[in-house]
Amino acid sequence: MSTESMIRDVELAEEQLPKKAGGPQGSRRCWCLSLFSFLLVAGATTLFCLLHFGVIGPQREEQFSSGPPFRPLAQTLTLRSASQNDNDKPVAHVVANQQAEEELQWLSKRANALLANGMGLSDNQLVVPSDGLYLIYSQVLFKGQGCPSYLLLTHTVSRLAVSYPEKVNLLSAIKSPCQKETPEGAERKPWYEPIYLGGVFQLQKGDRLSAEVNLPQYLDFADSGQIYFGVIAL
């Protein structure tokens, strides 16, 4: 082969090289365009999902973060009704008459006493206005000086029910301040004995409750807050 023919073959190969390279470059451009389109669609889909579910963008819940939580009207009315029902429950707290001599007499018209929401005081008894559970409580304070004889002090809360004609004791307690009689000529030392009673009972409308002692002459009327009787609806 001559030198001229070899040179001609090389020139022909160089002319054909761009044509052969054009095929791979075209397919590469198509692949890049497809990848760009896929990424664009995927990005748009992701952005839509984030906006739809509130991950990004303005959040309405933050507008109420500084104020009180939103409460439906029905829930507000229910809570208000429950509060009003609690305030409407019957309640009584009466205190002893400090002017009574050797008698336990209950008074409701005092600064530290009350009758509310249907509770009544009649014949020294508290009258229940409606059926339900009630907390009943009472306290008395006995005092004396020396022991002329053996003493038994009792405090009792009784119920006179509409459905039962006889009085029934609900709460009762006994205390003895004197174990033995004070001898003649010995020092007569003062003594004090408090008794507190309390319990929960099912009562009916019209029931009458009384708090009594067996020896009222030993009651200490020095302070009205020491002797009291009360009922609270639960």
Swiss-Prot record:
It is a single-pass type II membrane protein. Residues 1-35 are cytoplasmic. Pfam families: TNF (PF00229). PROSITE patterns: THD_1, THD_2. This is Tumor necrosis factor. InterPro entries: TNF, TNF_alpha, TNF_CS, TNF_dom, Tumour_necrosis_fac-like_dom. A lipid is attached at K19, K20 (N6-myristoyl lysine). Cytokine that binds to TNFRSF1A/TNFR1 and TNFRSF1B/TNFBR. It is mainly secreted by macrophages and can induce cell death of certain tumor cell lines. It is potent pyrogen causing fever by direct action or by stimulation of interleukin-1 secretion and is implicated in the induction of cachexia, Under certain conditions it can stimulate cell proliferation and induce cell differentiation. Induces insulin resistance in adipocytes via inhibition of insulin-induced IRS1 tyrosine phosphorylation and insulin-induced glucose uptake. Its main location: membrane. One of its GO terms (biological process) is positive regulation of protein-containing complex disassembly. One of its GO terms (molecular function) is tumor necrosis factor receptor binding. The lineage of its organism: Eukaryota, Metazoa, Chordata, Craniata, Vertebrata. The soluble form derives from the membrane form by proteolytic processing. The membrane-bound form is further proteolytically processed by SPPL2A or SPPL2B through regulated intramembrane proteolysis producing TNF intracellular domains (ICD1 and ICD2) released in the cytosol and TNF C-domain 1 and C-domain 2 secreted into the extracellular space. The membrane form, but not the soluble form, is phosphorylated on serine residues. Dephosphorylation of the membrane form occurs by binding to soluble TNFRSF1A/TNFR1. Residues 90-234 form the THD domain.
